[in-house]
Amino acid sequence: MRHYEIVFMVHPDQSEQVPGMIERYTGSVKEAGGQIHRLEDWGRRQLAYPINKLHKAHYVLMNVEAPQEVIDELETTFRYNDAVLRNVIIRTKHAVTEASPMVKAREERKPLTEVENNDFEDAEE
């Protein structure tokens, strides 16, 4: 089995469907004997350019090890799902398990936000 990195963007009005979509896609990979090495839900983000007059989309990143049949099935599913605006599937040489730069940047900002909130609470007292 080969390793793949999959990113897909979902219509912002369909964001509530994302957990179900992730569950379906990961389920099909696992049923075929594949593995999910990394799964990140980046949430709703600004697009670099408008797609179908939309300026935001819900991003999901998956790193999987799966047979080619499952990848073909995912491609077909993405193509015929109107909620998926764009997708990319890239074959990688190795399994990628460390956090992506998007998640690392978010984690670096969180402690600062917590400190700021504590300072704000102290100022109120």
Curated annotation (Swiss-Prot):
Pfam families: Ribosomal_S6. GO terms for molecular function: small ribosomal subunit rRNA binding; structural constituent of ribosome. Signal peptide: none annotated. It comes from the Bacteria. The keyword Ribonucleoprotein applies. Residues 104-113 have a biased composition (Basic and acidic residues). Residues 99-125 are annotated as: Disordered. Residues 116-125 have a biased composition (Acidic residues). One of its GO terms (biological process) is translation. Keywords: Ribonucleoprotein, Ribosomal protein, RNA-binding, rRNA-binding. The keyword RNA-binding applies. One of its GO terms (cellular component) is cytosolic small ribosomal subunit. Binds together with bS18 to 16S ribosomal RNA. Belongs to the bacterial ribosomal protein bS6 family. This is Small ribosomal subunit protein bS6.
